[in-house]
Amino acid sequence: MAFPVDMLENCSHEELENSAEDYMSDLRCGDPENPECFSLLNITIPISLSNVGFVPLYGGDQTQKILALFAPEDSLTAVALYLADQWWAIDDIVKTSVPSREGLKQVSTLGERVVLYVLNRIIYRKQEMERNEIPFLCHSSTDYAKILWKKGEAIGFYSVKPTGSICASFLTQSYQLPVLDTMFLRKKYRGKDFGLHMLEDFVDSFTEDALGLRYPLSSLMYTACKQYFEKYPGDHELLWEVEGVGHWYQRIPVTRALQREALKILALSQNEPKRPMSGEYGPASVPEYEARTEDNQSSEMQLTIDSLKDAFASTSEGHDKTSVSTHTRSGNLKRPKIGKRFQDSEFSSSQGEDEKTSQTSLTASINKLESTARPSESSEEFLEEEPEQRGIEFEDESSDRDARPALETQPQQEKQDGEKESELEPMNGEIMDDSLKTSLITEEEDSTSEVLDEELKLQPFNSSEDSTNLVPLVVESSKPPEVDAPDKTPRIPDSEMLMDEGTSDEKGHMEEKLSLLPRKKAHLGSSDNVATMSNEERSDGGFPNSVIAEFSEEPVSENLSPNTTSSLEDQGEEGVSEPQETSTALPQSSLIEVELEDVPFSQNAGQKNQSEEQSEASSEQLDQFTQSAEKAVDSSSEEIEVEVPVVDRRNLRRKAKGHKGPAKKKAKLT
C-alpha cells in the first residue's frame, strides 16, 4: 500500500493545491443533509464546510497551503489532510512503503515536507510537547532538515541553520556557524540512542571547526550531548551553545553548560521530590524521559535566574563605582551626608529637649492666661494655680529664659500705662486732687522699684538658688492686696461719696507694703523657707513663671489686685462709655485702679452682699494660708510638700463659684 510520502514524490505544490480547490467546490455543491464521513479509530467525522479549511504548509509563508480536516471538539487540531485526491489520517501520513527509507534522510520532496510539517506542527506541538519546552517554528521550504525513519515510519527529525543563512530574529544578520536549530524524537523511541545518532550525523555533515546548538538546550539535546562527550571526549571544544546568530560573545562551550545543568539537577534532587511517573508510554522510555524533562525544566529556570542575577550584580557594581558629578551644584545647595545629618539631628534633639519642654509649658500657661477672662478675684486666682505651679517647677532650670519674657512684658505694661494715662478725663476738682495724690504715690513706688531693680541686677542669674529666692517677694507682696481687697470692693460702687477715704486708705496700703520689704528680705536667707512659700502661697494672682519674674523686678505696688479691677469693670459696665479690654496676662498699676475708681459704677444691694460674702470668704481662707505658712517655716521642705492644703483651695473655689452673681456682660479694656 502506498502512502502519501511515496505518492507525492513527483507532485508540485500547485497540483496539490488545485486538487484541494476542486474538492472544496464539490463540497459546496454537495447535499448538506447527506455529508461525506471520514472514519478514524472507530470514530466517524462528518465532512462539511464548517470543519474543513486550508492551512499554510510553511508557517508564515501563505503561498503554499494544504486542505485539513478538523475534529468537531477541537477546531485547531487537524486529524486528516487532503493529499493525492483523498483524506489521509495523521498516523498514515508519517508512514512509507519504500524499504529504502531507513535512517536519517534529508528532506527534498513535497511528500517529505508534508511529513516534516506533520511531525513538527501536529505530533510534537499537539501531542508530545512538554510544558517547559518551547515549540518549534514551522520549517520553511528551503530549510536544511533530515527525517529519521525507522521500520517504515518517521520517528524524528532535526533541522540546521547553515552558515550564512538569514536569522529569522535578526533580519539583517546571518549565522556565523552551523547551528542545530530543532531536534525531535517521538517518546516511544527515546532511550535508544536515536538522539546521539542524530547529533553524530549533524557533526559529520558539517566540517566547520565550531558547531552550534540552539539555546536553550532541550532535554533531548542535553541527553544527546552528554552521550556524545562520553563517547568522544576529544570534541569538547567543538560544540557550542549559541544564542542569536552565534557571535563570539553569544556562545559558550557545551561542556560548561552541561556542568551547570548537572549542579542544578543535583540541587533540585535534594530539595524537591521526584514527580510520579504517568505510565502512559513505554516503561523503559518514560522514567528516563521524565527525569530528563524535570532536569531540563529546572535548568532552564535556573539559567534565567542566574542571568538576571549577573546582570543586576554588574549594574549595581557599576553604580557603586560611578561618582556623582557635583560641578554644577553650589555650596549652599549641597545636602549633608546621611550619617552627619543623623548625628546632628540626634545632638540637636538631645540638646534642645529641656528647652522644648520648658518653653512648651510656659507658652501653654501664658496662652491660657491671655485667652481666659477672669470674672471674679476669688475664683480665677485658684483656677490658674496649676499652670503657675508647672511654670515655677522650671524656674530653677531656666532663670535666664524667664528674665527675657519679663523684660518683654515691661515695655508692654508701660505702653498700656501710657495709653490709660492719655484716657484720663477730669471729672471734678476732687477727682483731680485724688489723681495728683495717686501720682505722688506712684512716684514713691517707682523710686522703691528702682532700688529693687538695682539690688536684683547685682544678683547673678546663673545660680538656681538665687532665682528661687525671688519667689517669696512675689508671694508675700501679693498677700496685702488680697487682705485689703474686701475693704475696697464694697467702697467702689459708692466712689462718688467715699473717694477721699479710698485714696487715704490706698496710701495706707502703700505704706504697709513698703514696710513689708524688710521682712521679705529676711525670708531670703534659707532655701527651705523659699520652697515652703513657693509650694503653699505661690502666686495667688495665678500668673506663670515669666510673670512672677517680672513681679520680682517691678515695684510692689504694681501687684495690687488686677483681678479686683477686672471684676469691678465687669460690674460697672453700664457707667463706662467706651469698651474696655481686660488684660489678664500683665498686672495693672495703682494708677489704672484710680482711674477705674473715678468712673461712677452702679451696683444694686444684692451685688454688694455677694461681694461682701466673697471678701469674707477670701479673707478667712487667706488667714488659714498664713497660719499654715508660718507652721511650714519651722518644718522641712519635704514635710511641707506633703501638707499642701489642696482641700482648702478646692473649698475656696467652690465658695467662690457659689457666690458668683448673675451673668455679667464683659467689656474689653482699651
Curated annotation (Swiss-Prot):
Localisation: Nucleus envelope; Nucleus inner membrane
Region (Disordered): 273-301, 314-670
Any single GO CC term annotated in Swiss-Prot or TrEMBL for this entry: nuclear inner membrane
Biased composition regions of type Basic residues, renumbered to the chain: 651-670
Keyword terms of this UniProt record: Membrane, Nucleus, Phosphoprotein
Lineage: superkingdom: Eukaryota
Major subcellular location class: nucleus
The keyword Repeat appears for this protein: no
Ranges of Basic and acidic residues composition bias in the record: 414-423, 479-494, 504-514
Phosphoserine found at: 350, 379, 449, 515, 615, 618, 635
Bias (Acidic residues) ranges: 378-387, 442-453
Residue stretches of biased makeup (Polar residues): 358-375, 460-470, 558-569, 579-591
Membrane topology annotation: Peripheral membrane protein
InterPro entries tied to this protein: FAM169
Family the UniProt entry places it in: Belongs to the FAM169 family.
Protein name: Soluble lamin-associated protein of 75 kDa
